[in-house]
Amino acid sequence: MPSLWDRFSSSSTSSSPSSLPRTPTPDRPPRSAWGSATREEGFDRSTSLESSDCESLDSSNSGFGPEEDTAYLDGVSLPDFELLSDPEDEHLCANLMQLLQESLAQARLGSRRPARLLMPSQLVSQVGKELLRLAYSEPCGLRGALLDVCVEQGKSCHSVGQLALDPSLVPTFQLTLVLRLDSRLWPKIQGLFSSANSPFLPGFSQSLTLSTGFRVIKKKLYSSEQLLIEEC
């Protein structure tokens, strides 16, 4: 009994090739060339799609045109973004600003009597942000900072104190914060800057509000780099 394959073979051989009508075939490149062209066309389409998708996502995320996007990114530095995701340094900075205000409240600017120096809320915020920014690139962050506090009035600069967030840690960099007294208060505070021979009068003379302007000098204690001075 013939098998199914034998039947198929006999039926196909019985039909003469010459009896079948020939259909004209148009000239076309070989299959390999056609496949290569198809792959290249598909790759070009996918590349175009990916590029347009990225451009669409970028423009929808920023909300600006190409020129506005470039200007926006130029105005934003990497530390500004990283500060938002660093709760430890933000917490340390809040503690440092509290210590700073307490030190200023007991400051002694002259030999006669101490003065209570007050930081406006705007000054507290600006100083905190600047200290965080300067500590961003340090190996221990703000924990490795040694902060010297000075108050400037005219050509004189009076030291208030030195603060360290973590006394058990060897400082990696030093920050000198130079605060300023409002020049309009000078007639009221001239008595605070008397000579050393003047008698000391106990008690606080008055509360003085500091100016919102300040200067920060950064010095790396493990490097010979030049001093970095930030004027705000």
UniProtKB/Swiss-Prot annotation:
Residue positions, PTM Phosphothreonine: 23, 25
Single GO biological process annotation from the record: neurotrophin TRK receptor signaling pathway
Protein induction: Up-regulated in fibroblasts upon ionizing radiation, via a TP53-dependent pathway. Up-regulated by TP63 in primary keratinocytes, and down-regulated during keratinocyte differentiation. Up-regulated upon DNA alkylation. Up-regulated by amyloid beta-peptide and retinoic acid. Up-regulated by hypoxia, via a PI3K and HIF1A-dependent but TP53/TP63-independent mechanism (at protein level).
Assembly information from the UniProt record: Monomer. Interacts with BTRC. Identified in a complex with CUL4A, DDB1 and BTRC. Interacts with TXNIP; this inhibits the proteasomal degradation of DDIT4.
Family: Belongs to the DDIT4 family.
The organism of origin for this protein: Homo sapiens (Human)
PTM characteristics: Phosphorylated by GSK3B; this promotes proteasomal degradation. Polyubiquitinated by a DCX (DDB1-CUL4A-RBX1) E3 ubiquitin-protein ligase complex with BTRC as substrate-recognition component, leading to its proteasomal degradation.
Name of the gene encoding the protein in the UniProt record: DDIT4
Organism domain of life: Eukaryota
Protein name stated in the entry: DNA damage-inducible transcript 4 protein
GO cellular component entries: cytoplasm; cytosol; mitochondrion
Primary location recorded for the protein, binned into one broad class: mitochondrion
Region (Disordered): 1-71
Subcellular localization, as worded in the UniProt entry: Mitochondrion; Cytoplasm, Cytosol
Positions bearing Phosphoserine: 19, 121
